[in-house]
């Protein structure tokens, strides 16, 4: 199964958002339906092995039925799902490369997960990064109380109201 993770909300002066590809999830076994008792941390830097020797980011055994559950973070497709943006830095000839998806229905696609034997029920938190329409990058943005507001040096505010992280089964 494939799951998409979205950042949703009411966006103002936001060109795009992206998250660090390491985050805590809640999962449940697709074999017996039992939820895993703790959150699991999925990270693109972790490498494990699945049932058939394939590379995965996380492999866990269900405590109820002993089924092996595997999860893998997939790269978003360049051009179709994400586009490269070069953001100016403090140095004249330097740029920072970021990959942003287009907003669709008041949300941005920020990650895709492939699972075997597991269903992703929720994402608990993430490290959020925001790019304003003026190409200003805000890193490690705090989204307590479901609201994000950042001001750049031009006194322009970028905000997300009713911020939420949602997980959907991909079609």
Curated annotation (Swiss-Prot):
Source domain of life: Eukaryota
InterPro entries linked: CXXC_Zn-binding_euk (IPR008584)
UniProt name for this protein: Uncharacterized protein ECU01_0250
Organism: Encephalitozoon cuniculi (strain GB-M1)
């Amino acid at each position: 199964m494939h799951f998409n993770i979205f950042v949703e909300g009411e966006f103002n002066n936001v060109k795009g958002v992206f998250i660090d590809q390491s985050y805590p999830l809640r999962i449940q076994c697709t074999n017996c339906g039992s939820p895993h008792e703790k959150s699991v941390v999925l990270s693109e830097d972790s490498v494990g092995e699945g049932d058939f020797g394939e590379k995965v980011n996380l492999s866990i055994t269900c405590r109820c039925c002993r089924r092996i559950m595997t999860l893998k973070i997939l790269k978003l497709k360049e051009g179709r799902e994400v586009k490269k943006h070069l953001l100016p830095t403090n140095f004249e000839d330097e740029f920072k490369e970021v990959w942003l998806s287009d907003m669709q229905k008041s949300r941005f696609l920020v990650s895709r997960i492939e699972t075997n034997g597991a269903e992703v029920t929720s994402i608990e938190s993430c490290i959020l990064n925001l790019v304003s329409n003026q190409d200003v990058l805000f890193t490690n943005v705090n989204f307590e109380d479901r609201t994000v507001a950042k001001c750049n040096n031009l006194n322009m505010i970028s905000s997300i109201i009713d911020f939420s992280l949602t997980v959907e089964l991909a079609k």
